[in-house]
C-alpha cells in the first residue's frame, strides 16, 4: 500500500511539472516554514509578468459646477476666458461657446450702469476666470472698475480684427495713392481736365460760401431775436420787482387771506373756513381744537379786536415817545409784545418779529415755535 501511494504521488508531481513548467512545483522545504501544504507555487520564467496599471491623470472638471466630464456632459472651451465648461454651464452663440459668466457680462456691453446691476458673485467670478486678483476690492464699484480696466484681456479677437482692418485700409490707401501718383494723363487732355477741375472747385467754393453766409445771417437774426426776448423778459422782471417793492403784500394777498384784508367784524362772518384758518395760521394762533366754524370766527374776531386795540394804543404811545414803555417789541420797537418764544418762554418780541427769530435774544436758545398770546 505504501509503495502504491508513493508511486501515485510521484506521477502526480510529474504531471504538474509538465503542465506548470520545470521547478514550478516544489516540495515542502525547511527554508519555508510559513507554507502549510505540501506544494509551493513559484512564478515561472516562461510566463511574462504584466506591468502595473498606469495611474490615471488629473481628472478635469467643469469650472462652474465642478462635475467631471462624461459622454452626457461634454467638455467645451469658452472662447473668452479659455476655460473648460460643460454643456450645461456654457451657452452656444454663433458657433461659439461662452460660459454663463462671460455671456452675462457680454450682454451688458460693458456699460457701467449695466455692470452695477450685476451681482458681486458674477463680477468676482469673471475676474477669477481671467486670473485677476480681487483681494483689494472692498466695494462693488471697485470690481466694476477692475472689469472695465481689464476688459481688453478677453477681447483679443476684436483687437486682431480691428488691427487687420486698419492694416487693410492702410494698404489700400497706399496702393491708390501710388497708382494716382504714377498715372500721367495724355498731353492732349491735360488742359481740359484742369479746366474741369477749376470749374468744379469754383462752383463748390461758391456754394460753400453761400451756405456759410446764409448760416451767419440766420445766426445773427436768431441772436437779435434772443436779445430782444431777453430784454423783454428783463423789463417784465423789473416791472414785477417794482410792483412787489411798491406793494409787498400783493402776491401774498392773492394766495392767502390776511388779517389786514379785514375792514370790519362783519366781513369775518362771510369768510370761508379755509380763509379763517389761513388768518389764524399766519398770526400763529392754534385752532386744532376748533370743530365748528363759529369757533374759528370767534378766534378771528378776538384777534381782529386785539389788533385794533394794539394799533390804537400804539397811536397813543407815539404821542408819549419820551416815556419808557416796557410793552414794546425789543426788536422793532414799534409793535406791542404779543408773542411768546418756545421752548424758553420769553416774551420780548411782537408776532412779526417772533416768526423771524431763529434764537431767543435773551437766552440764545433755539426758537422751536412762536405762539401768539392774548392779553386778559
Curated annotation (Swiss-Prot):
Annotated catalysed reactions: S-ubiquitinyl-[E2 ubiquitin-conjugating enzyme]-L-cysteine + [acceptor protein]-L-lysine = [E2 ubiquitin-conjugating enzyme]-L-cysteine + N(6)-ubiquitinyl-[acceptor protein]-L-lysine
Pathway where this protein functions: Protein modification; protein ubiquitination
Zinc finger (FYVE-type): 56-107
Keywords assigned: Apoptosis, Cell membrane, Cytoplasm, Membrane, Metal-binding, Nucleus, Phosphoprotein, Repeat, Transferase, Ubl conjugation, Ubl conjugation pathway, Zinc, Zinc-finger
Site description Cleavage, residues in chain: 236-237
GO cellular component: cytoplasm; cytosol; endomembrane system; nuclear speck; nucleus; plasma membrane
Record bears the keyword ATP-binding: no
Residues annotated with Phosphoserine modification: 169, 258, 260
E.C. no: 2.3.2.27
Cleavable signal peptide: none
Region (Disordered): 216-256
InterPro entries: CARP1_2_FYVE, CARP1_FYVE, RING-FYVE_E3_ubiquitin-ligase, RNF34L-like_HeH, SAP_dom_sf, Znf_FYVE_PHD, Znf_RING, Znf_RING/FYVE/PHD
Compositional bias (Acidic residues): 221-246
Limits of the SAP domain: 115-134, 268-282
CDD domains: FYVE_CARP1 (cd15769), RING-HC_CARP1 (cd16706)
Listed GO biological process terms: apoptotic process; cellular response to cold; negative regulation of extrinsic apoptotic signaling pathway via death domain receptors; negative regulation of signal transduction by p53 class mediator; nucleotide-binding domain, leucine rich repeat containing receptor signaling pathway; proteasome-mediated ubiquitin-dependent protein catabolic process; protein K48-linked ubiquitination; protein ubiquitination
Stated role: E3 ubiquitin-protein ligase that regulates several biological processes through the ubiquitin-mediated proteasomal degradation of various target proteins. Ubiquitinates the caspases CASP8 and CASP10, promoting their proteasomal degradation, to negatively regulate cell death downstream of death domain receptors in the extrinsic pathway of apoptosis. May mediate 'Lys-48'-linked polyubiquitination of RIPK1 and its subsequent proteasomal degradation thereby indirectly regulating the tumor necrosis factor-mediated signaling pathway.
Protein name: E3 ubiquitin-protein ligase RNF34
Amino acid at each position: 500500500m505504501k509503495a502504491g501511494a508513493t508511486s501515485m504521488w510521484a506521477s502526480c508531481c510529474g504531471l504538474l511539472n509538465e503542465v506548470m513548467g520545470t521547478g514550478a512545483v516544489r516540495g515542502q522545504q525547511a527554508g519555508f516554514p510559513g507554507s502549510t501544504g505540501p506544494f509551493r507555487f513559484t512564478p515561472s520564467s516562461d510566463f511574462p509578468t504584466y506591468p502595473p496599471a498606469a495611474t490615471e491623470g488629473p481628472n478635469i472638471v467643469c469650472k462652474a459646477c465642478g462635475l467631471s466630464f462624461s459622454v452626457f456632459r461634454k467638455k467645451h472651451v469658452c472662447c473668452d476666458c479659455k476655460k473648460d465648461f460643460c454643456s450645461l454651464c456654457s451657452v452656444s452663440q454663433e458657433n461659439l461657446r461662452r460660459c454663463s459668466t462671460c455671456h452675462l457680462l457680454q450682454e451688458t456691453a460693458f456699460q457701467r450702469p449695466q455692470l452695477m446691476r450685476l451681482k458681486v458673485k458674477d463680477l468676482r467670478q469673471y475676474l477669477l476666470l481671467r486670473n485677476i486678483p480681487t483681494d483689494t476690492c472692498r466695494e462693488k464699484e471697485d470690481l466694476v472698475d477692475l472689469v472695465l480696466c481689464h476688459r481688453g484681456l478677453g477681447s483679443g479677437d476684436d483687437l486682431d480684427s480691428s488691427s487687420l482692418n486698419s492694416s487693410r485700409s492702410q494698404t489700400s490707401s497706399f496702393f491708390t495713392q501710388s497708382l494716382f501718383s504714377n498715372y500721367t494723363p495724355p498731353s492732349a487732355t491735360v488742359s481740359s481736365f484742369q479746366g474741369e477741375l477749376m470749374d468744379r472747385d469754383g462752383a463748390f467754393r461758391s456754394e460753400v460760401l453761400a451756405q456759410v453766409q446764409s448760416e451767419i445771417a440766420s445766426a445773427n437774426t436768431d441772436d437779435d431775436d434772443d436779445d430782444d426776448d431777453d430784454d423783454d423778459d428783463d423789463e417784465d422782471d423789473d416791472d414785477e420787482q417794482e410792483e412787489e417793492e411798491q406793494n409787498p403784500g400783493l402776491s401774498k394777498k392773492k394766495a392767502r387771506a390776511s388779517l389786514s384784508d379785514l375792514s370790519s367784524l362783519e366781513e369775518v362772518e362771510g369768510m370761508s373756513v379755509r380763509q379763517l384758518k389761513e388768518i389764524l395760521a399766519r398770526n400763529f394762533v392754534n385752532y386744532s381744537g376748533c370743530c365748528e366754524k363759529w369757533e374759528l370766527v370767534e378766534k378771528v374776531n378776538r384777534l381782529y379786536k386785539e389788533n385794533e386795540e394794539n394799533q390804537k394804543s400804539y397811536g397813543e404811545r407815539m404821542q408819549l415817545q419820551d416815556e419808557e414803555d416796557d410793552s414794546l417789541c425789543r426788536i422793532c420797537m414799534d409793535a406791542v409784545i404779543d408773542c411768546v418764544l418756545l421752548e424758553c418762554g420769553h416774551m420780548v418780541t411782537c408776532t412779526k418779529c417772533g416768526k423771524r427769530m431763529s434764537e431767543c435774544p435773551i437766552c440764545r436758545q433755539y426758537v422751536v415755535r412762536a405762539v401768539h398770546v392774548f392779553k386778559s
